[in-house]
């Protein structure tokens, strides 16, 4: 939803994203499923409106989690900061509802945009490397702390290998 996730990261690391609701006047669309980026910008041009967004409801999270997990699975669910959206709160409510089916660990990223994408990518890389859920959560919390506090002395601890498809800043 609110993560700026490079398309190749989503595919390469198998990252699932719950769509946010995009509202153009009275019409609502699910990001990515009912409205892709091209369609979004086309609607902005045609309607001359700035759309609004609405976080997924707890029910939408329950359905989403059930669509990507099986009984007994653990889901690490990283979200836009609760200071900007109710998404994290919806995820927490859904996690509580599903506690007898599987474990959902909602994380408030304390940021948005590319920071969330980075956390998701690193979590998947660690999972593929055989790290435990606790190790992954601890590492993501470390990235969150660096990104939210902005401590320049810790910047070298953030893994920022960018894909080759991005233009050079030189």
Write out the residue ranges for each language-model feature.
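N-terminal glycine-rich anion-binding loop in soluble enzyme alpha/beta folds
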Residues: 1-55
